[in-house]
Swiss-Prot record:
SMART domains: EFh. SUPFAM superfamilies: EF-hand. Ca(2+) 2 binds at residues 133, 135, 137, 139, 144. This is Grancalcin. Residues 49-84, 85-119, 120-155, 156-191 form the EF-hand domain. This protein has been shown to bind calcium with high affinity. The gene is GCA. Keywords: Calcium, Cytoplasm, Membrane, Metal-binding, Repeat. It is found in: Cytoplasm; Cytoplasmic granule membrane. It is a peripheral membrane protein. Ca(2+) 1 binds at residues 103, 105, 107, 109.
Length: 218
């Protein structure tokens, strides 16, 4: 296996989540139900309306008059939704980088369409977390994180994986909130890099200011 990169080794990842009830996990996972290789999240499909939708109900309950949520409102929305299940609610910092991941117009806020995309990703990441947490500890360790990242289609070197574990673990264990923060940052930075990797060969050139804009926001 070649390191590093995100080239042809990603597989065909697809998952259908829109329309699920709040807090409901993604259907059975495994080798046949995987995630999009580049982004590490399901391909989003806007196939359902807001009418009678519990996702929209929770979003609209905290959204401002502009129809968007900031990080604090997103945190409240996700906590009220119960999407974390038995895990601790998402921290404010994790909610900040969730918004940054999908903040394509740089407003520092998230509209409903972006929220639906986030909702799909969170359900998939949660199911992935539960799948690799084989001992049911509520945390993932180094070898379990390696499996989770592999299921998401990323090809990372052992050195990079070790760096990620050191950054997001507490005593060698990664809790769900930190795991999601890792997934968000991995997706966002990969998307940022991939847009500049014009030949899709795992290398890119960009200026310093562009680098700072892309990385400091996450």
């Amino acid at each position: 296996m070649a390191y590093p990169g995100y080239g042809g080794g990603f597989g065909n990842f697809s998952i259908q989540v829109p329309g699920m009830q709040m807090g409901q996990p993604v259907p059975e996972t495994g080798p046949g139900i995987l995630l999009d290789g580049y982004s590490g999240c399901p391909a989003f499909s806007d196939t359902y309306s807001s009418a009678g939708d519990s996702v929209y109900t929770y979003f609209s309950a905290v959204a401002g008059q502009d129809g968007e949520v900031d990080a604090e409102e997103l945190q409240r929305c996700l906590t009220q939704s119960g999407i974390s299940g038995t895990y601790s609610p998402f921290s404010l910092e994790t909610c900040r980088i969730m918004i940054a991941m999908l903040d394509r117009d740089y407003t520092g806020k998230m509209g409903f369409n972006a929220f639906k995309e986030l909702w799909s990703a969170l359900n998939a990441w949660k199911e992935n977390f539960m799948t690799v947490d084989q001992d049911g500890s509520g945390t993932v360790e180094h070898h379990e994180l390696r499996q989770a990242i592999g299921l998401m289609g990323y090809r990372l070197s052992p050195q990079t994986l070790t760096t990620i574990v050191k950054r997001y673990s507490k005593n060698g264990r990664i809790f769900f909130d930190d795991y999601v923060a890792c997934c968000v940052k991995l997706r966002a930075l990969t998307d940022f890099f991939r847009k500049r990797d014009h030949l899709q060969q795992g290398s890119a050139n960009f200026i310093y200011d562009d680098f700072l804009q892309g990385t400091m926001a996450i």
